[in-house]
């Protein structure tokens, strides 16, 4: 696996793929994220790190659309998408994974990937009767694409197995394949290394690098600093709901304030 070279990647300020501007989030009077701004550059792999309680998961969910900011905004190409739900953000090319994937256990691996297919005419009841030819063509194209995605994530041999037989790492690869069915340009990865054995983690990292080489912009939350340092050209560290530091993985991890935040728990 060849990790991306920081010198070869655009800076976030050059052309952000997605950005948060002065975002604050309150829960019942408790401020979990306070005046946070960040930009994910086009073609960048950005790491978001911090101790438990730092607010990074809330920040991630604000970017993904699972939460709406109390103030500030989330923007794509200058458009405020703060009020849009995750399924609406897919239309803007933004998709996410979850720390704990929950596939449909009795459906096959292939069928789980097909769930991610977007804008299928056959989803509308009467289209099956009025436009059967179009429905069949779209279903065929989606099936072919799903097989390509399974090949990409190295799960082709398990295509017809029920998803319940997959290991934790394989479920993360399955979820990545499902996300890719939507052709996202911005991919938000929620702790992709959590619960994954070392061989499968290498596969996941290799796939992330391959996606980045295709021009995908990727933001990941991760506690595995080895993964962060190998994948990310830039890292943002949070503590107590605020920006603590940003820069290269080496510089941020060497910052005494970041070290203290981790040792102190950050909450």
Spans of features found by a protein language model:
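Conserved ABC transporter NBD signature motif
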Residues: 72-79, 91-92
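Conserved ABC ATPase "signature" region
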Residues: 125-158, 206-209
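A short, surface-exposed alpha-helical micro-motif characterized by mixed small hydrophobic
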Residues: 228-230
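The feature captures the beta-strand-to-loop junction immediately N-terminal to the Walker
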Residues: 49-51
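Catalytic Walker B motif of ABC-type/P-loop ATPase nucleotide-binding domains
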Residues: 187-191
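Helix-to-loop junction immediately C-terminal to a conserved catalytic motif
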Residues: 64
